[in-house]
């Protein structure tokens, strides 16, 4: 039926009538009451106004489009137990494209306009002009530099020409003067003048000769320097080439020694091994001529001969260091009490040194020192010695972690590769890759998450009661955390994980056990902190969300508020353009339950979930426990394949044959396919929640892998602890032992949390650091106390309180919980606590000065000093410095202090006393003792 008035139109649009009246008035349609009639023109006017307000073109064509892109990556991080966890990181990118308006069809008469240059062309031309300007500037600078150089050369030439012209003028003038004087003076004076001229000419020639000699000497010196540099370079190059040739030369066969030709080149200075100039049979009676060289002389071409000649020198009678056996080499003549052998192995079995062999060492996760030495073909003592050089004391049977072993291999000159060659688990992956089985559709695995007070348990109970047969309803056991429900459109498997322990463990191991998450939110309560935590878990796992807004039957239910709060947490409903369906349900009346299951199945169809059926089963441990009568019991969710009774399964380090299989109703079953939860018995131990379960071909292989995992886990744990101790030691040494004050902060609102965290982190110094382990909004829960126990942190509650269970747990574990209402009180108390963690400042306070006037030596006591107190006071146990000629000789403590024969606590100025120094007797008369004490002063921030 077409709507004729405002009220009917509002009902059709599912919105309040007063809001519709406001929008009509904004659009220019004057309607005063809900009974006013609406025409089609009024509705078109309202629609055009709303489109204009939301940025949509009037003709209905979209002017902009928004694209969202998600990228999921994985990073690995070690947890507190040392196990490696995979954390998924999702990056979202959003880009909006706006369509520009097309130019109008009707325009003014066509006018030939100048060609339009786009921005890229303008930028290119600007860049070209800038380059041209830079080129012109460089050319101008080069031209200016050349002109300056030419001007300088011309100025120098002009100066030389002027000097030459001046010298010629002076010479001519002197000659004219000399002629005049010669005409005026008698003959003997002319003779004197000629002698003076001769002297001047000789002096000028000598100065020219000296200048030429100096220039020649400078040129000669420069040539000598260049020649010396070139000679040194050639010497180094020759030495390098000779050493390389010697190292790469093949080992020679044993043959009779041939006479060595004399080497004409001078011996190298400063070398220990010098080549022999004589033949081996000749005596060395004549002394060698002394060879002196200002520069480094060139070594012999045959460098290896210098090593061979050592034995010949010793056989000729030349004794070297430690060689007391008449030319025998070695540090000792022979073993104790035995005659010395005349056989020299080095003379006959000499081999040229070969190049070091670099090995590729495969390093597993853990390896002992002995195994690592065997892989590198070296002695274990060499490996232990290298470890000691690296600062780690170890034994031959000590287990090293992979990182330490790889560093050690690199230090010893080999190439290390991380490998798992001895890991029997490699066969599991190979077998899984080879299996090619057809995948069939499977049921979705759904995890129900949300706040405990939002009706999650009631919703699950209603689903059980509605979808499980009446006869089977009483057989449901409450401790099983997984069950499946049959619907007309298919089966759904629900996963109930209280506290989300299994969900977190599965996500950490990179296994995607959950396909869809149902987020339960109460309509009257809204989004709570645990709801935010559930949203974060679901986003980190990368699974779609289906939001169930519960308790819609309550009068205080407000769906719009819940939607707005969820939008603030980046959970956008489909009706607003998001990807999360919102379903209002009531666990009390059952309203909306079918629609919720329908949405879950729709999401499963979109995901196209498939798994192989005819193959060995694989799955995950949902939860496990130790039953008194049945032993280890594990609830397993089969992910692929079919699990049958009697199969040999492996779950982590636990293994065994499936002796019994029960479904969620407690009934015995013989097999279970994909997405079916079952409870199995027969394992050797209780596996961890989230461990991967797989069916093995035989029990022997399962036992081998299980025992290997047990040993590897133990070895890795021990190796990690050892490495952590060493790293912490070096880190503390490097940082000066920085102390940490770990904290967990819980506040009432987000603003208080940010302000408190910022204020406390500003208190960090170089010695004490505030470490905020966790900060969140809400009350203090048991999980916060458990985190505080693990991290040894202090819990600060700002306008929040801990619940009864959290208080009980904190009291049992000794966790300190502090409550504050004023932020400055919290900052002041934390500041005081950090001040108490600061190491006290030590200051010396001088007490007195003592002069030693007599020294008495007593056999059993040592040196006793008879002293006179010059200044201050002397106290027993005080620290002293011994001054000799005003130079500090020793610093220590007083051992005893006496006045006459009685022990004295202190001796004041002007009195005499006797004293002894602790572990020091080198005292003389006239020495002075400076007495002081060290005081510790508390520091503040």
Curated annotation (Swiss-Prot):
Q: Where is this region: G3?
A: 496-499
| Source superkingdom | Bacteria
The molecular function terms in GO held by this entry are:
GTP binding; GTPase activity; guanosine tetraphosphate binding; translation initiation factor activity
| GO cellular component terms attached to this protein's record | cytosol
List the residue ranges of the region (G5): 586-588
Q: Where is this region: Disordered?
A: 170-228, 252-351
Q: Which Pfam families match?
A: EF-G_D2, GTP_EFTU, GTP_EFTU_D2, IF-2, IF2_assoc, IF2_N
Q: Fetch the InterPro entries from UniProt.
A: DNA-bd_dom_put_sf, EF-G-like_DII, EFTu-like_2, IF2_assoc_dom_bac, IF2_II, IF2_N, P-loop_NTPase, Small_GTP-bd
Q: What is this protein called?
A: Translation initiation factor IF-2
